[in-house]
């Protein structure tokens, strides 16, 4: 019963889409209507509003961190263990991907996964974030950076901690993240993927809104 509650609470936390909420609060176009149509920080950046993108990034990462941190923090009080943490990790991630509050149409989970990893272990989270930053810096492809980070995250976890139940949730998150980027993979291969900072499509969408 405790793990079921953990799953439901974590999923609901994950279902809060900061990309949509922040954009609406700041009078911007719905991120699901322009660019990649993905409600995430990278696509919000295409609106040209860096503050909105940063707030989205922080919010999506925070909810991932919060769900896992709460589970660990209250583990002693409610008899929770690493299995509970693993459940919280995948549940909050699924909430972001398929949010009940937004017709189950969510983002791709990069920032939320980063928050989850930081909560599981700061070193694991930082190593994965550095992987994303290095690839993104040299290629300006957010999607390629995310794919590389998704591949390396389980490897970092295995190197740091060996076989453990939480690793299963990390592998599951990585697999889902790669699956959610399947269209991006096709665009990367075709040389048609948008780079970080590309906001032409967003500006067109915003002008149509007014």
Curated annotation (Swiss-Prot):
Pathway: Lipid metabolism; phospholipid metabolism. The chain crosses the membrane at residues 4-24, 52-72, 82-102, 118-138, 159-179. Keywords: Cell inner membrane, Cell membrane, Lipid biosynthesis, Lipid metabolism, Membrane, Phospholipid biosynthesis, Phospholipid metabolism, Transferase, Transmembrane, Transmembrane helix. It is an enzyme of class 2 (transferase). One of its GO terms (biological process) is phospholipid biosynthetic process. Its EC number is 2.3.1.275. It is a multi-pass membrane protein. GO terms for molecular function: acyl-phosphate glycerol-3-phosphate acyltransferase activity. Its main location: membrane. HAMAP family: PlsY. This is Glycerol-3-phosphate acyltransferase. It comes from Paraburkholderia phymatum (strain DSM 17167 / CIP 108236 / LMG 21445 / STM815).
